[in-house]
Amino acid sequence: MAKIALKVDVDTLRGTKEGVPNLARTLERFGLKATFLFSLGPDHTGWALKRVFKPGFLKKVSRTSVVEHYGIKTLLYGVLLPGPDIGKQAATQMRAIDAAGHETGIHTWDHVAWQDAVRNRDPQWTKAQMQKSWDRFVEIFGHPPVTYGAAGWQMNEAAFEQLDQWGIKYSSDGRAQPNLIPYRFELHSGKAKHVQYPTTLPTFDELIGIDDADEFGAVKKLLEITQSNPNDQVFTLHAELEGQKLLPAFEQLLAGWLNQGHDLVTMGELHRSWEATKQLDKIAVQPVTWGEIPNRSGELILQVG
C-alpha cells in the first residue's frame, strides 16, 4: 500500500527520559524505525499556561488531561521550578535512539519559547535559537542532524532559510490534509531548496474527546483514513502521549497499519522514496501560509490547495 512516516516529537524532559525509551522498545518489538525530533535546551513547559487565554486551548485541555500526560512537575518548569536542560540531563536516552538505528533530528531549543514566539520574532533571534539547537545536537550525537521538524508547527521565513543554509534536504514543519503532496516554500529570498513533508494525519490529541472518542476511538478513526488508501502519509506522535499513557493505543495503531499493508518508515526513507520518482524538481511551490486545523488551538504552518 502506502508509506506512513512515523515522526516522534519530543517536547519535555519527562518525555525524553521516559516516553522515548518506551517508544523505542515498542518499535523494536514491531521491527520498525522512526524519526525522533528532540527538544535540546531548557524545558519551560510551565510557560505554556499562558495559552489559557488563547481561543480553543481550554477546550483542548478539557478533552486531553494535560496533568495526566505531562505530570505536575513538568507543568511547573519555568514557573515554580527552574527549567531543566533536557540535552544535558537526557543525552543518554537520546544517544540510545541514535545507536538503535532510528533517525534523529532537531525539534527545537526551547519548545515553549519557540512555539509561542517565533512567528513574530526577527531573524537574529530565530537563528540564535536554531544555532543553539544545532550545536547541542552535534555535541550529543557527534554528527549533524539530517532533518528538522518545527515545534508546534511554527516557523518563520528566517527559519526556513536557516534550514537551507544548514543543508537540510527534507523537513516536516507544517500540516496538511490527508494524502501527502510534498512541496517547497517560496520565500522572499527565492525558492527553498529543502522539501517539506507536512503532517497529514490528525494527532491523537486532536481526536480524543471528539464525539466522545477515547484513545482507541482515535485509533479507529486513523485506520479509517488509511484503509485501502494508496497515498503516503506523515503521522506525528509525541513521546509525552504515545510514549506513556497512550502507548497501548499506539501499539494497536501500528498493528492496524501493518495489517492494512502499509510500510511504516522514517522521514528519511519517505524522502528517498520520493527522490526515486525523479519528481521532486517538479513539485509545487507555495508561499508560507498560516491557518487553523480542527481541534487544535491557534494558527500554524499550513499547506494550501
Predicted regions and their residues:
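Positively charged, amphipathic and often flexible ligand-engagement surfaces
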Residues: Q196-I210
